[in-house]
UniProtKB/Swiss-Prot annotation:
Endonuclease that catalyzes the cleavage of RNA on the 3' side of pyrimidine nucleotides. Acts on single-stranded and double-stranded RNA. Its main location: secreted. GO terms for cellular component: extracellular region. It catalyses: an [RNA] containing cytidine + H2O = an [RNA]-3'-cytidine-3'-phosphate + a 5'-hydroxy-ribonucleotide-3'-[RNA]; an [RNA] containing uridine + H2O = an [RNA]-3'-uridine-3'-phosphate + a 5'-hydroxy-ribonucleotide-3'-[RNA]. Gene3D superfamilies: Ribonuclease A-like domain. Disulfide bonds join 54-112, 68-123, 86-138, 93-100. The active site is at residues 40, 147. Keywords: Disulfide bond, Endonuclease, Hydrolase, Lyase, Nuclease, Secreted, Signal. Belongs to the pancreatic ribonuclease family. This is Ribonuclease pancreatic gamma-type. GO terms for molecular function: lyase activity; nucleic acid binding; ribonuclease A activity; RNA nuclease activity. It comes from Rattus norvegicus (Rat).
Length: 152
């Protein structure tokens, strides 16, 4: 009888997981490189001129679903330019790992910072454009960007 109960509970668990898995968002099926592209790449044109750029981008890229991400940076350069940073100067990441690389030249970026009074679901961001070196973590073979670490 104990075996039958265990078998029933296991079958029920498999059934529930089968229902839950398809309902998970795109984010759960992304590779780290795809997540980096979704969260940080915006190759379109020059610096954004709209003061609501960050509000629009953070929402459209899925970074305000269930909570407001406090800070994010978008890079306005071709993906190939950012991928090439993985073969440039290696530096230590903020978390102490040694898989970060610093761009040899400055890149066009936009920082999105959550305003202090902003609360989910009304995520409100300040938009700041600048030109800085970026530091990204790279993994894989070939190396590809998987994490935006900093801008300097």
């Amino acid at each position: 009888m104990g075996l039958e109960k265990s078998l029933f509970l296991f079958s029920l668990l498999v059934l529930v997981l089968g229902w839950v898995q398809p309902s998970l968002g795109v984010e759960s099926r992304e590779t780290p490189a795809q997540k980096f592209e979704r969260q940080h790449m915006d190759e379109e044109g020059p610096f954004p001129s709209s003061p609501t750029y960050c509000n629009e981008m953070m929402k459209s890229r899925g970074m305000t679903s269930g909570w407001c991400k406090s800070m994010n940076t978008f890079v306005h350069e071709p993906l190939a330019t950012v991928q090439a940073i993985c073969s440039q100067g290696q530096v230590t990441c903020k978390n102490g790992r040694n898989n970060c690389h610093k761009s040899s030249s400055t890149l066009r970026i936009t920082d999105c910072r959550l305003k202090g009074s902003s609360k989910y679901p009304n995520c409100d961001y300040t938009t700041t454009n600048s030109q800085k070196h970026i530091i990204i973590a790279c993994e894989g073979n070939p190396l590809v960007p998987v994490h935006f670490d900093d801008s300097v």
